[in-house]
Amino acid sequence: MSFLEIKGLHKHYGPVAALAGVDLDVASGSRTAIVGPSGCGKTTLLRLIAGFEAPDQGRIVLDGEVLANGGAAVPAHRRGIGVVAQDGALFPHLTIGDNIGFGMGRGDDKRAERIVELAYIVGLDKAILKRRPHELSGGQQQRVALARAMAMKPRLMLLDEPFSALDTGLRASMRKAVAELLEAAGITTILVTHDQAEALSFAAQVAVMRDGKFSQVGTPRDLYLKPKDRMIAEFLGDAIILPASISGGFANSPLGRIAVDTNDSRDVARILLRPEQIGLKRTSREGMSGTPDMLFGEVTESEFAGSTCTIAVRLLNNFDPPDAAAIGNTPLILRKSGMDAPAVGEIVRLTVSGKAHVFV
């Protein structure tokens, strides 16, 4: 039995369906990320789980307790759920210590000790407990918000895009630190984000939301390498989608014969490769006289961005499945290491590693 069960959840705002039949199971102590474009319903779902609003239809069950069943709902303060918002939502007139201990009873003899302990757990020095929120950095404020949420010993932690306002480097380190803290505490966690890389790196389970319901739920690896459809493939990362015919575990495509993840046979199909599966090796036009199954291209664009370089490669020879000519005239967009990326005008040999995914 799942720790959190969501079944058939619906929510309307007037004629607009914010949620249109959401189902989700979350295991105890796990981390789940809900990712999707703005307006897809992910924040509405978080508000219903937290108890800030009630669903029109559907059930929410947490650790065997029914929190919501249609319009009947347990109040937010009785759910045992912690929430960390995007801006931290700290009280500006309170000290950091009082922010962390806001939900604790004033008469608790161990209140001060617990506040110091929580500050230590989230990586804050006790010296800052007498400061005000405006005296802290964005990363420190988010740690305070997390400590405040953990102070109530929640059964479930909800993170509503808590890292989006942080600088890129700090965002990555904070995400890793928060994941480790929550895992060590054994707290089941749901992260809502519009950042695909954040969702894939943070969670053991990722749910892609579109138009008020989940399009696909699974492990980060399965969603990235075996997306259900083209929309999910392109939403989760750069995608190379090619026409192909499938037979005997291989695809005949504009990039040649490529191993695929199915043994089905199809005359017409679409396959997915990720740009990192395409290898490049410098050569010359004279070096293009290899075996017939070799594929060559010319670099037509190169955009340096430090550690990475985005390059466009126009195929110079391609194979002959349907639409091959059109694909041959469309450059492949690839990301390679910025240290030794080929320059515009260079000739490269292309190779494919791993298997391509065949869309169902």
Swiss-Prot record:
> What protein am I looking at?
Fe(3+) ions import ATP-binding protein FbpC
Q: Where is the ABC transporter domain?
A: 4-236
Q: Which GO terms describe its molecular function?
A: ABC-type ferric iron transporter activity; ATP binding; ATP hydrolysis activity
Gene from which this protein is expressed: fbpC
- Secretion signal span: none
User: Quaternary arrangement and interactors, per the entry?
Assistant: The complex is composed of two ATP-binding proteins (FbpC), two transmembrane proteins (FbpB) and a solute-binding protein (FbpA).
- Which reaction does this enzyme catalyse, per its entry? Fe(3+)(out) + ATP + H2O = Fe(3+)(in) + ADP + phosphate + H(+)
Q: Which Pfam families match?
A: ABC_tran
- Entry annotated with the keyword Membrane: yes
User: Topology versus the membrane, per the UniProt entry?
Assistant: Peripheral membrane protein
- Location of this chain's protein in the cell: Cell inner membrane
Q: Which UniProt keywords apply?
A: ATP-binding, Cell inner membrane, Cell membrane, Ion transport, Iron, Iron transport, Membrane, Nucleotide-binding, Translocase, Transport
Q: What is the lineage of its organism?
A: Bacteria, Pseudomonadati, Pseudomonadota, Alphaproteobacteria, Hyphomicrobiales
- InterPro entries attached to this UniProt entry: AAA+_ATPase, ABC_SmlMolc_Importer, ABC_transporter-like_ATP-bd, ABC_transporter-like_CS, ABC_transpr_FbpC, P-loop_NTPase
Q: What does this protein do?
A: Part of the ABC transporter complex FbpABC involved in Fe(3+) ions import. Responsible for energy coupling to the transport system.
SUPFAM superfamilies of this UniProt entry? P-loop containing nucleoside triphosphate hydrolases
Q: Where does ATP bind?
A: 36-43
Q: Which family does it belong to?
A: Belongs to the ABC transporter superfamily. Fe(3+) ion importer (TC 3.A.1.10) family.
One Gene Ontology CC term in the entry: plasma membrane
Q: What is its EC number?
A: 7.2.2.7
